[in-house]
């Protein structure tokens, strides 16, 4: 869902493949937009490499930190959330992954929960009860769902 949002936000732009980071990137107006090419469960590794490159992690990163790093002004993560009804969203920072493996990977690699997140609801009770979660999240959106997503994307863009 994050890829769809970035396509909505940026329109047709040229994405550069960075093999070192395992990501597609686009930089504009001082912002770096990233589409990880890794499995979702390994998103943290991609994010860590990028933040290290831009020196946004503490110098003693990797050691046990006395205080967690606060990345709320440096990192925004957009992800799907099966616990939120389709077409709704919530924001979060300094909170647990709530079982989302991609978010947990980021928390594990960065050793902090202090980053900003947009949790985009994809829950559909009719389908969800029939399809295992790991397959449900890979389903394509239909035309009506895509229209609803564009409404949500517009709301999120205002907040970002």
Model-based region annotation:
Residues 1-93, 104-118, 125-132, 146-158:
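Nucleotide and nucleotide-moiety/phosphate-recognizing core
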Residues 90-96, 136-141:
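Short glycine-enriched, charge-decorated loop/helix-capping segments at active-site entrances
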């Amino acid at each position: 869902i994050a890829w769809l949002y970035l396509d909505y936000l940026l329109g047709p732009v040229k994405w550069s493949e960075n093999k070192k980071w395992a990501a597609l990137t686009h930089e504009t107006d001082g912002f770096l937009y990233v589409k990880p090419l890794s499995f979702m469960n390994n998103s943290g590794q991609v994010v860590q490499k990028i933040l290290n490159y831009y020196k946004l992690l503490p110098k003693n990163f990797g050691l046990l930190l006395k205080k967690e790093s606060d990345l709320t002004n440096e990192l925004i993560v957009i992800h799907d959330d099966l616990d939120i009804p389709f077409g709704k969203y919530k924001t979060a920072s300094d909170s647990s992954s709530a079982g989302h493996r991609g978010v947990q990977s980021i928390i594990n690699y960065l050793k902090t929960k202090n980053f900003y997140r947009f949790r985009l609801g994809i829950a559909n009770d009719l389908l969800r009860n029939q399809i295992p979660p790991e397959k449900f999240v890979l389903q394509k959106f239909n035309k009506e769902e895509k229209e609803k997503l564009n409404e949500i994307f517009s709301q999120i863009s205002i907040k970002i």
